[in-house]
UniProtKB/Swiss-Prot annotation:
CDD domains per record: S14_ClpP_2 (cd07017)
Role noted for this protein: Cleaves peptides in various proteins in a process that requires ATP hydrolysis. Has a chymotrypsin-like activity. Plays a major role in the degradation of misfolded proteins.
Keyword Amino-acid biosynthesis appears in the UniProt entry: no
PROSITE patterns: CLP_PROTEASE_HIS (PS00382), CLP_PROTEASE_SER (PS00381)
Catalysis: reaction(s): Hydrolysis of proteins to small peptides in the presence of ATP and magnesium. alpha-casein is the usual test substrate. In the absence of ATP, only oligopeptides shorter than five residues are hydrolyzed (such as succinyl-Leu-Tyr-|-NHMec, and Leu-Tyr-Leu-|-Tyr-Trp, in which cleavage of the -Tyr-|-Leu- and -Tyr-|-Trp bonds also occurs)
Protein name, UniProt field: ATP-dependent Clp protease proteolytic subunit
Species: Clostridium botulinum (strain Hall / ATCC 3502 / NCTC 13319 / Type A)
Length: 194
């Protein structure tokens, strides 16, 4: 059972209560705090589009504490972040692993952050398939194409040579907040809100 806190605000019209995520959205804050899947991607894409419609010139802040998840779902979020007009600032709180790390790096350059004790993990895509040999071959080819695409984007986002990213993502590669900064996944480690 998931408990979502409620915030009560006093206005000149009386009291108004919001669930905490709706209240944060009012301040242009989106939380990715679970596995990336079709449901979370749809919610985040909708929030990004809503905030762009509200004010296309004001930054959006995406807080990430995620173990990663589906590549296609993550790419829907990534593409939307690049598509919309407002800059999307990303902030790692806790852990940004796999697709979570990819989305962290996808934030607007100069506006990608991590809290001091957060951790980032990059690796190659995971997948599995059962079936006929021909179908297994088709899926293996697809995952290799995805691996190349993800590594190319990470290389662009970090400034690291593609060969280095390919080597570093071959296995689980854990980085502290400072190491993530040195790697180019984030721009700054922050301990106080600006």
């Amino acid at each position: 059972m998931s408990l979502v806190p409620v915030v009560v605000e006093q206005t000149n019209r009386g009291e108004r209560s919001y669930d905490i995520y709706s209240r944060l959205l009012k301040d242009r804050i989106i939380m990715l705090s679970e596995e990336v899947n079709d449901t979370t991607a749809s919610l985040i894409v909708a929030q990004l589009l809503f905030l762009e419609a509200e004010d296309p010139d004001k930054d959006i802040h995406l807080y990430i504490n995620s173990p990663g998840g589906s590549i296609t779902s993550g790419m829907a979020i990534y593409d939307t972040m690049q598509y919309i007009k407002p800059d999307v600032s990303t902030i790692c709180v806790g852990m940004a692993a796999s697709m979570g790390a990819f989305l962290l790096a996808a934030g607007a350059k100069g506006k990608r952050y991590a809290l001091p004790n957060s951790e980032v993990m990059i690796h190659q895509p995971l997948g599995g398939f059962r079936g006929q040999a021909t179908d297994i071959g088709i899926h293996a080819e697809r995952i290799l194409k995805m691996k190349k695409k993800l590594n190319t984007i990470l290389s662009d986002r970090t400034g690291k040579p593609l060969e280095q990213v390919e080597l570093d993502t071959e296995r689980d590669h854990f980085l502290s907040a400072e190491e993530a900064k040195e790697y180019g996944l984030i721009d700054e480690v922050i301990d106080k809100k600006k």
